[in-house]
């Protein structure tokens, strides 16, 4: 997502050269940094009071307004500058998941930003996603109220719901249906002639029958993810000019700890009785939603027409608190101007 710059046009460049006239100023700056450092206070507010600051979220706009208030209190000239808009907004709440079985466990997962939450607490059985038309017809009746385990490994992005993704699905379905016919022939030959032909592998595409599974009543989709789990956002949807509040995703897109995914996948294959339960509070906001840069400046006394630009991006992915990316930039940047 577009990086948002916190641009601070500062006064004349501060140096630490050992010039006698500058000794007092340098000493004062060092003393403030050692004895009155406010960086952790800035980080505490940004990461714990506001948390993840996704573009299009209330948390981002609240954080931007707070930065304006802080800069004004330090005597800076500051303003909010409109940077752009997103078609819809997104606010993330808490999320929970459980495996309900004799070996039940709390599930470790995340969902990409700008994807759907659940409709309250939702519980259901699990099925493997179909790879061809025959498999889809076989499980169609079990999709209603089911959590679907999909193929592939999570890299942060959600299921591709775009028109280009649908075009890829059409081609892969055709190829897999041909592979299915060849495999059926191989099975027949193995049975009739005692041959030991191996089955041909099917091509994978996460959510290959996505629309069909949604229409059949699936509760949501679960994909295996390496740990730490990476969750980004629905970039294709946000860049689509046709995106609006009436054509948003309706089912959760869960990225589950690969070790737990493997356990659940094996339980499905073994046809063991169990259920999965999720409560995911992802909420959309009517758009378009504007987002802003925070621009603050201190006019230099000696070189008023020269600038030192100090910046960091205030936005952050919202599955965490944005302490590293980019709290470690915003905290020092903001405090630099207090010392100036």
Which residue ranges define each predicted feature?
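Bacterial Sec-dependent N-terminal signal peptides
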Residues: 1-22
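N-terminal hydrophobic or amphipathic helices/low-complexity stretches enriched
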Residues: 19-77, 233, 298-302
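Soluble metallo-hydrolase cores and metallopeptidase-like ectodomains found primarily
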Residues: 23-25, 108, 114-138, 239-322, ...
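Stable alpha-helical elements in mature extracytoplasmic
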Residues: 25, 39-42, 59-67, 135, ...
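Second-shell loop/turn segments in exported
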Residues: 27-33, 50-58, 126-129, 194-203, ...
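Noncatalytic luminal/extracellular "stalk/propeptide" segments of secretory-pathway proteins
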Residues: 44, 48, 52-186
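Loop-rich non-cytosolic ectodomains and luminal regions
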Residues: 185, 193, 201, 206, ...
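Conserved small/polar residues in nucleotide/adenosyl-binding loops
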Residues: 336-340
């Amino acid at each position: 997502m577009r990086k948002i710059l916190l641009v601070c046009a500062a006064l004349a460049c501060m140096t630490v050269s050992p010039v006698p006239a500058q000794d007092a100023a340098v000493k004062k700056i060092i003393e403030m940094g050692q004895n009155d450092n406010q960086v952790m206070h800035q980080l505490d507010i940004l990461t714990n009071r506001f948390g993840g600051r996704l573009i299009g979220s209330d948390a981002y706009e609240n954080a931007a307004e707070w930065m304006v208030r802080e800069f004004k209190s330090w005597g800076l000239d500051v303003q909010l500058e409109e940077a752009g808009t997103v078609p819809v907004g997104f606010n993330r709440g808490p999320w929970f998941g459980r495996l309900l079985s004799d070996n039940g466990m709390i599930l470790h997962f995340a969902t990409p930003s700008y994807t759907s939450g659940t409709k309250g607490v939702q519980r259901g059985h699990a099925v493997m996603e179909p790879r061809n038309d025959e498999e889809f017809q076989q499980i169609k009746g079990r999709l209603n109220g089911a959590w679907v385990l999909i193929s592939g490994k999570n890299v942060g992005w959600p299921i591709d719901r775009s028109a280009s993704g649908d075009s890829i699905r059409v081609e892969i379905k055709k190829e897999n249906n041909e592979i299915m016919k060849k495999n059926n022939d191989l099975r027949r030959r193995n049975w009739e002639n005692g041959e030991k032909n191996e089955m041909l592998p099917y091509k994978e595409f996460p959510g290959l029958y996505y629309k069909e599974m949604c229409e059949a009543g699936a509760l949501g989709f679960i994909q295996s993810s390496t740990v730490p789990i990476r969750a980004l956002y629905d970039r294709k949807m946000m860049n689509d000019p046709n995106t609006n509040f009436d054509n948003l995703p309706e089912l959760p897109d869960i990225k589950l700890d690969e070790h737990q995914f493997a356990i659940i996948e094996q339980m499905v294959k073994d046809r063991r009785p169990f259920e999965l339960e999720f409560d995911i509070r992802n909420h959309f906001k009517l758009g378009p939603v504007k987002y802003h840069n925070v621009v603050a400046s201190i006019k230099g006394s000696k070189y008023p027409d020269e600038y030192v630009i100090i910046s960091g991006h205030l936005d952050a992915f919202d599955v965490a608190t944005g302490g590293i990316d980019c709290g470690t930039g915003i905290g020092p940047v903001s405090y630099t101007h207090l010392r100036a």
